[in-house]
Amino acid sequence: MSSETVSYFSHPFPRRQSVGVSVGGVIVGGSAPVVVQSMTNTDTADVDSTVAQVAALHRAGSEIVRITVDRDESAAAVPKIRERLERLGHDVPLVGDFHYIGHKLLADHPACAEALSKYRINPGNVGFKDKKDKQFADIVEMAIRYDKPVRIGVNWGSLDQELLTALMDRNQAEGAPLSAQDVMREAIVQSALISANLAEEIGLGRDKIILSAKVSQVQDLIAVYTMLAQRSNHALHLGLTEAGMGTKGIVASSAAMGILLQQGIGDTIRISLTPEPGGDRTREVQVAQELLQTMGFRQFVPIVAACPGCGRTTSTVFQELAQTIQEDIRRNMPLWREKYPGVEALSVAVMGCIVNGPGESKHADIGISLPGTGETPSAPVFVDGKKVTTLRGPGIAEDFQKMVADYIENRFGLGRKIAS
């Protein structure tokens, strides 16, 4: 995994120092960059569909992918999925998402236990009453046996009710009781920390434990992760559960995680979006990357800056060109990462009129200022801050696309290395 450090602007808060955890060779926490991960929504027993979706998520940039392991058929499929992915060249860590019977599935399917890179345990449903600690311990012991890390993932929708009830009763006995919301937040944090302490007592190292505490409200998420960060040095997995569809899910997740990341809290993130019918699952990976890149913490793809448009830009040419360039970059990035090291740092500007167009284009590595309404039908192009040509005629878009491709080849390609 890349260990780049990016600083578009100074970070007002130091990064929280957590214990690094290796997940199939991808380091989460410590001094490693914040990791992007995602989860499939296929039936894991359907090997073909799951392999296809994991491969798509990995190509999109997901550095870790979680899959559901909910029954014998799913567990039996995991080694086949792992083998098929490796044959296709996708060496991506797979995380097994276990609920209720994870201890049994891992025991009954040792090949599954070996093929997974991490186990996810939910303290709220790993077992109930007198079976809870035993079944939790069984999974932890499996992790120790197979040298795998675990994520202890608390979720407010399946919170340990015994713990919550005990805290509620204790709170009522206080002279100045806390609100029910505050007690719930405390229960979530305690569930994670108590489970982590138990895992360590069983023998799992702190460098094998990642914590998460997922809720569906932005302020709750900020509160519980701030508490976790203050009370432990475990690596933290950020995620807003049930964030929702479309812009609502994107805004809610970005608002919550952006605040935490800005405070130095968070070692890996997943943007949980409810896909629209027929929607692309890789969208959540793209949003996670854009969040980290926009905040200046990582670089994944070249930035395409474009003006929002106004009454001076009634033509849609600049919008269409910006979209085409962005889609072309996304489509080619898997190849470009290998062929053009450092291409992630490229910036492209596609502007729509003379007001800010030339200035913005000069600030990009390569930029074009297209004519606005009533302006001369010509488009100056700037490379590394200098005007190099003016494009005219109906082929402006195609000509600029070729210039972008040539710039990438000349700056990041093999020819540059030979010349240097």
UniProtKB/Swiss-Prot annotation:
Pathway stated in the Swiss-Prot or TrEMBL entry: Isoprenoid biosynthesis; isopentenyl diphosphate biosynthesis via DXP pathway; isopentenyl diphosphate from 1-deoxy-D-xylulose 5-phosphate: step 5/6
Matches recorded under Pfam families: GcpE (PF04551)
Gene3D superfamilies listed in its UniProt record: Dihydropteroate synthase-like (3.20.20.20), Sulfite Reductase Hemoprotein, domain 1 (3.30.413.10)
Domain of life: Bacteria
Keywords, alphabetical: 4Fe-4S, Iron, Iron-sulfur, Isoprene biosynthesis, Metal-binding, Oxidoreductase
Enzyme class: oxidoreductase
Cofactor: how bound: Binds 1 [4Fe-4S] cluster.
GO biological process: isopentenyl diphosphate biosynthetic process, methylerythritol 4-phosphate pathway; terpenoid biosynthetic process
Function summary: Converts 2C-methyl-D-erythritol 2,4-cyclodiphosphate (ME-2,4cPP) into 1-hydroxy-2-methyl-2-(E)-butenyl 4-diphosphate.
NCBIfam families per the UniProt record, alphabetical: ispG_gcpE, PRK00366.1
PANTHER family (UniProt xref): 4-HYDROXY-3-METHYLBUT-2-EN-1-YL DIPHOSPHATE SYNTHASE, 4-HYDROXY-3-METHYLBUT-2-EN-1-YL DIPHOSPHATE SYNTHASE (FERREDOXIN), CHLOROPLASTIC
Family statement drawn from the similarity comment of this UniProt entry: Belongs to the IspG family.
Name of protein: 4-hydroxy-3-methylbut-2-en-1-yl diphosphate synthase (flavodoxin)
Organism listed in the record: Brucella abortus (strain 2308)
Gene that this sequence comes from: ispG
